[in-house]
Amino acid sequence: MPDTVSNVVSNATFDVAVIGAGPAGLAAAARAAESGARVAMVDDNPRPGGQIWRASRTPEPWLRSQVEVFSGARVFAAPEPGVLALERSHSNLELRYRSLILATGARERFLPFPGWTLPNVMGAGGLQALAKSGLPINGKRIVVAGSGPLLLAVAKYLRGHGADVRLIAEQADSSAIFRFGLGLIAKPGKLIQAAQFRAGLLGIRYLTACWPIAARGVERLESVTLQRNGKTWTEPCDYLACGFGLIPNVELPALFGCRMSETGVAVDDYQQTSVAAIYCAGEVTGIGGLDLALVEGEIAGYAAAGKPRDAGKLFAARKSNRQFAGALERAFAPRAELRNLPQDDTFVCRCEDVTYARVRQCSNWREAKLHTRCGMGPCQGRVCGGALEFLLGWKPDSVRPPVLPARVGSLARPG
């Protein structure tokens, strides 16, 4: 017998609805609730916390006493102003709100190269998440490659859980990283954090101006070929954890018609978007790290709850954290040589098996979708979209509901 799916129309109207239960969403919900607002929080994970806070570090008991949490739920459409359509495992729900805070976070940027679709080649954060969920990595040979501080955090975690981390391949130049490190002198907390990462990685090779050019194996990954200073070599490994920075998850804000900036969703001083009563906070406005996400979430929470003076007290802290985020972006920006990674027969869209040669025959996203089905598979362009924006300069196509894959029955509104 198939599982039954119930349709529910919520009679409650929340003052503030927060989408996303990562650091920015948690901070927003906390400040809105303490300001007296009736708050709902929606997240597609089983527990709040996002990719940063999990398990015992998540303040779940407090949240559930102050905020109505809809875990394991995801927004797939906005059928009318002030209404969200949610899908859960066995039910659909319409949630009503007066103000909306979108803290949808970011995802890893993947760049295609020969062999990147082999089993055991995965995102750096993805491998860490799987390890947290029980994937056995003890004794496994792992190469961590890509760009940014996330590589260090992932390598430290994997090593701490028994993995044999062979090396970290950072595509940024040592000079750029050195300049970034000098800037940490003005931020003692960040400097201490960086020192702790390095201490946890003693004995692991950290190679700058280095990146993977091919993953090799028959049925699964067996080795990765790396390039540095014009030389190449092959490193045997069981896993390749690869990530070239992060991409803001702007699909839901785009569905609402929010204006975009060069870095993400455009917001004003109070984190309000171009659409009235809709706010954005955290990585969705631009990649900035944990501290910036927290303060942006607090500002959005206060503002959405009608406390602009409290929000204004946090502007200085946000400015400082934005300066750090800008330095981070400049230091670890993907180099131009990475555009040469995919070969003609390299799959760019792994969902629909579309090669780079076929995609290059098109001039934009819409044409590629029509002629090759690129971006029309289960991930809806979330993997190939970021890659093609970097490789070919294509901007994301317009967003239409459902924002995420949804059951056919979910698309029929209740009642």
Give residue ranges: language-model regions:
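A conserved FAD-binding loop/helix module that cradles the flavin
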Residues: 281-316
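Active-site-proximal substrate-binding core of FAD-dependent oxidoreductases
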Residues: 272, 302-341
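Beta1/beta-strand and adjacent pyrophosphate-binding region of the FAD-binding site
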Residues: 11-24, 140-145
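N-terminal Rossmann-like FAD-binding beta1-loop-alpha1 element of flavoenzymes
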Residues: 16-38, 154-158
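Glycine-rich FAD pyrophosphate-binding loop
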Residues: 34-51, 166-175
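A Rossmann-like FAD-binding core segment of flavoenzymes
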Residues: 62-88, 95, 161-251, 261
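FAD-site-proximal beta/loop scaffold in flavoenzymes
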Residues: 122-131, 239-288
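Glycine-rich dinucleotide-binding loop and its adjacent helix/turn
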Residues: 106-143, 147-154, 262-269
